[in-house]
From Swiss-Prot:
Record note on domains: The N- and C-terminal portions are exposed to the cytoplasm. Lacks a typical peroxisomal sorting signal. A region between helical transmembrane domains (TM) 4 and 5 and TM1-TM3 or TM4-TM6 are necessary for the peroxisome-targeting activity.
MF terms (GO), sorted A to Z: ADP transmembrane transporter activity; AMP transmembrane transporter activity; antiporter activity; ATP transmembrane transporter activity; coenzyme A transmembrane transporter activity; FAD transmembrane transporter activity; FMN transmembrane transporter activity; NAD transmembrane transporter activity
Gene3D superfamilies, sorted: Mitochondrial carrier domain (1.50.40.10)
Cytoplasmic compartment spans: 1-9, 88-104, 182-202, 302-307
Name of encoding gene: Slc25a17
Oligomeric and partner information: Interacts (via N- and C-terminus peroxisomal targeting regions) with PEX19; the interaction occurs with the newly synthesized SLC25A17 in the cytosol.
Protein name: Peroxisomal membrane protein PMP34
Originating species: Mus musculus (Mouse)
Length: 307
């Protein structure tokens, strides 16, 4: 119990949250482009650069940062939960011994499940706020009119029921493999490098963070597309119950996507996603590692986690 409620786990959680918020703020416009490509299927522009120019031209210079606050709020909570759970479970299971690839994957998966169940409502709301006011090419999308985060929660619960806040939970649960795979490769690559040197450089951390995220994103991207569509939940031609995003709905969306756009339709927006997530993850891990190390140094503490 002491390992779960330790100061060390809290330091890792705060550092992870700060790192993710910093990185997402820097690369937020890339995430805006990715989301438009996933949700607005009839948009003709295919590249990140073209979509961003379109958004700025049609909706204003600050449009790529629309929905920044709810996204950052959700991301901060989400990463705090994930890093806290990951490091607490690792401390309990590993108990000062060296970890392994298998243990990192299992701990990452469990941390991901906890994170999804607790924070999905925040992501549903921020997805809708981020897309509110966007000029869609798809006429099947029903516009929203939320005044803010609280009003969005109120309207969704009033009009669609409280379970609508967990739209897309099923694909989100499948997607816990994304951070699990990411952390498995990240921790594994760190272990390999630390066998050859005493300390990792900033460039080392940036590169292994980028590699780990690139692998995880490419493997799980089709499910991320389905997740975005279900969270948005404003398509007129999707009348069936989207709550929790059942396996049937997930398979149906995957089938429709392939039927309309071919197999590459499952990877629409991947360029923007890779560009954004790889750079974001790399910067996030860099800030996280530096902040964690600095905190332990200032407080005169020594990390009990062994990689």
């Amino acid at each position: 119990m002491a390992s779960v409620l330790s100061y060390e786990s809290l330091v890792h959680a705060v550092a992870g949250a700060v790192g993710s918020v910093t990185a997402m703020t820097v690369f937020f416009p890339l995430d805006t482009a990715r989301l438009r490509l996933q949700v607005d299927e009839k948009r003709k522009s295919k590249t990140t650069h073209a979509v961003l120019l379109e958004i700025i031209k049609e909706e204003g210079l600050l449009a790529p940062y629309r929905g920044w606050f709810p996204v950052i709020s959700s991301l901060c909570c989400s990463n705090f939960v994930y890093f806290y759970t990951f490091n607490s479970l690792k401390a309990v299971w590993v108990k000062g011994q060296r970890s392994s690839t298998g243990k990192d994957l299992v701990v990452g998966f469990v941390a991901g499940v906890v994170n999804v169940l607790l924070t999905t409502p925040l992501w549903v709301v921020n997805t809708r706020l981020k897309l509110q006011g966007a000029k869609f090419r798809n006429e099947d999308i029903i516009p929203t009119n939320y005044k803010g985060i609280i009003d969005a929660f109120h309207q969704i619960i009033r009009d669609e029921g409280i379970l609508a806040l967990w739209n897309g939970t099923f694909p989100s649960l499948l997607l816990v493999f994304n951070p699990a795979i990411q952390f498995m490769f990240y921790e594994g690559l760190k272990r390999q490098l630390l066998k050859k040197r005493m300390k990792l450089s900033s460039l080392d951390v940036f590169i292994i963070g980028a590699i780990a995220k690139a692998i995880a994103t490419t493997v799980t991207y089709p499910m991320q597309t389905v997740q975005s569509i279900l969270r948005f939940g404003r398509h007129r031609l999707n009348p069936e119950n989207r709550t929790l995003g059942s396996l049937r709905n997930v398979l149906s969306l995957l089938h429709q996507r392939v039927k309309r756009f071919g197999i590459m339709g499952l990877y629409k927006g991947l360029e923007a996603k890779l560009l954004q997530t790889v750079l974001t993850a790399a910067l996030m891990f860099l800030v996280y590692e530096k902040l964690t190390a600095a905190t332990f140094t200032v407080m005169g503490l020594k990390s009990t986690h062994k990689h």
